Amino acid sequence: MSLSPHQKTAGWLVGVVVVMGAASFAAVPFYDWFCRVTGFGGTTAVASEAPAEVLDRTIRVRFDASREAGMPWEFRPLQREMEVRIGETGLAFYEAYNPTDRTVAGTASYNVTPDAAGGYFAKIACFCFTEQVLAPGERVEMPVSFYVDPAIVKDRDGRYVRQITLSYTFHQTELPEEQAALAARPAGIDVN
């Protein structure tokens, strides 16, 4: 069975569309992984504890918050900036509020600028490590514990950094299965 030139072209085009779709689907997780591994684009490090060394030099940390289009939450930092000593653990809070009449889940992506500081800004604990689920009308304060690695003062570019901006963007995600089941259940019905 021989295919006509039109059928071959159509088959080739379908293959191109499938490959492009797969590549676009894989691009976001691949880019996220790449940035976390290399610190590219200001991606921060994750640490289990702060370093033992705390320097006298301070650095100003600014906090920024945004939402992707369609994310219904209100989201903001509870402080605009703070001054921390390099190596000292800082603790900041963000607030999220779900003004809708439905349960909404979200995850936060993050970035640090300038890019030279990304590899030296380490988070010990962060709301961005897990998915957040807010019930209708729920308001929460979410902490982020961090430090600036003292090695920044020895970095060719990092030693000139005097201010770091930590930015978060909240993205709406699918509700976890158990939350979706609860949200779909009519009010007043008890499953027990």
Swiss-Prot record:
Organism, scientific name: Cereibacter sphaeroides (strain ATCC 17025 / ATH 2.4.3) (Rhodobacter sphaeroides)
| Classification lineage | Bacteria, Pseudomonadati, Pseudomonadota, Alphaproteobacteria, Rhodobacterales
InterPro entries (alphabetical): CtaG/Cox11_dom_sf, Cyt_c_oxidase_assmbl_CtaG
Gene from which this protein is expressed: ctaG
Query: Could you give a GO molecular-function term held by this entry?
Result: copper ion binding
Question: How does the record classify its membrane topology?
Answer: Single-pass type II membrane protein
Entry keyword annotation includes Transmembrane: yes
- What family does the Swiss-Prot or TrEMBL record give for this protein? Belongs to the COX11/CtaG family.
Q: What spans does the record annotate as topological domain Cytoplasmic, numbered to this chain?
A: 1-9
> What keywords are annotated for this sequence in UniProt?
Cell inner membrane, Cell membrane, Copper, Membrane, Signal-anchor, Transmembrane, Transmembrane helix
Its localization reads: Cell inner membrane
List the record's Gene Ontology CC terms alphabetically: plasma membrane
Which Pfam families does the annotation name?
Answer: CtaG_Cox11
Q: Which GO terms describe its biological process?
A: respiratory chain complex IV assembly
Q: What is the purpose of this protein?
A: Exerts its effect at some terminal stage of cytochrome c oxidase synthesis, probably by being involved in the insertion of the copper B into subunit I.
| Protein name (Swiss-Prot/TrEMBL) | Cytochrome c oxidase assembly protein CtaG
Coiled coil feature spans? none
- Topological domains on the Periplasmic side lie at 31-192
Major location (coarse): membrane
Keyword match Transmembrane helix? yes
